[in-house]
From Swiss-Prot:
<keyword id="KW-0997">Cell inner membrane</keyword>
<protein>
    <recommendedName>
        <fullName>Sec-independent protein translocase protein TatA</fullName>
    </recommendedName>
</protein>
<keyword id="KW-0812">Transmembrane</keyword>
<dbReference type="Pfam" id="PF02416">
    <property type="entry name" value="TatA_B_E"/>
</dbReference>
<dbReference type="GO" id="GO:0008320">
    <property type="term" value="F:protein transmembrane transporter activity"/>
</dbReference>
<keyword id="KW-1133">Transmembrane helix</keyword>
<keyword id="KW-1003">Cell membrane</keyword>
<feature type="transmembrane region" description="Helical">
    <location>
        <begin position="1"/>
        <end position="21"/>
    </location>
</feature>
<comment type="subunit">
    <text>The Tat system comprises two distinct complexes: a TatABC complex, containing multiple copies of TatA, TatB and TatC subunits, and a separate TatA complex, containing only TatA subunits. Substrates initially bind to the TatABC complex, which probably triggers association of the separate TatA complex to form the active translocon.</text>
</comment>
<comment type="similarity">
    <text>Belongs to the TatA/E family.</text>
</comment>
<dbReference type="GO" id="GO:0033281">
    <property type="term" value="C:TAT protein transport complex"/>
</dbReference>
<dbReference type="InterPro" id="IPR006312">
    <property type="entry name" value="TatA/E"/>
</dbReference>
<dbReference type="GO" id="GO:0043953">
    <property type="term" value="P:protein transport by the Tat complex"/>
</dbReference>
<comment type="function">
    <text>Part of the twin-arginine translocation (Tat) system that transports large folded proteins containing a characteristic twin-arginine motif in their signal peptide across membranes. TatA could form the protein-conducting channel of the Tat system.</text>
</comment>
<keyword id="KW-0811">Translocation</keyword>
<keyword id="KW-0472">Membrane</keyword>
<feature type="region of interest" description="Disordered">
    <location>
        <begin position="42"/>
        <end position="81"/>
    </location>
</feature>
Length: 81
């Protein structure tokens, strides 16, 4: 009994449309949608920035390190043979 029925919501919607007009309501809806989209984009940009900068040091290339380690091994193999 204390809740708002569907008919009451429809009457309120008609009154709002009559007061503001459809163009103004469409503009308000578009502004609200772009604000929500901007907020979501800012949140995702912040999360991706946190994921990119995870460590305090510069990453090293494994290829250079493997090449340095491979060179002494070949010399050892030649000496043993």
């Amino acid at each position: 009994m204390g809740g708002i029925s569907v008919w009451q919501l429809l009457i309120i919607a008609v009154i709002v449309v009559l007061l503001f007009g459809t163009k103004k309501l469409r503009g308000i809806g578009g502004d609200l949608g772009s604000a929500v989209k901007g907020f979501k984009k800012a949140m995702s940009d912040e999360d991706s920035a946190k994921n990119e900068k995870d460590a305090d040091f510069e990453p090293k290339s494994l290829e250079k390190q493997q090449q340095k380690e491979a060179a002494p091994e070949t010399k050892k193999d030649k000496e043993q043979a």
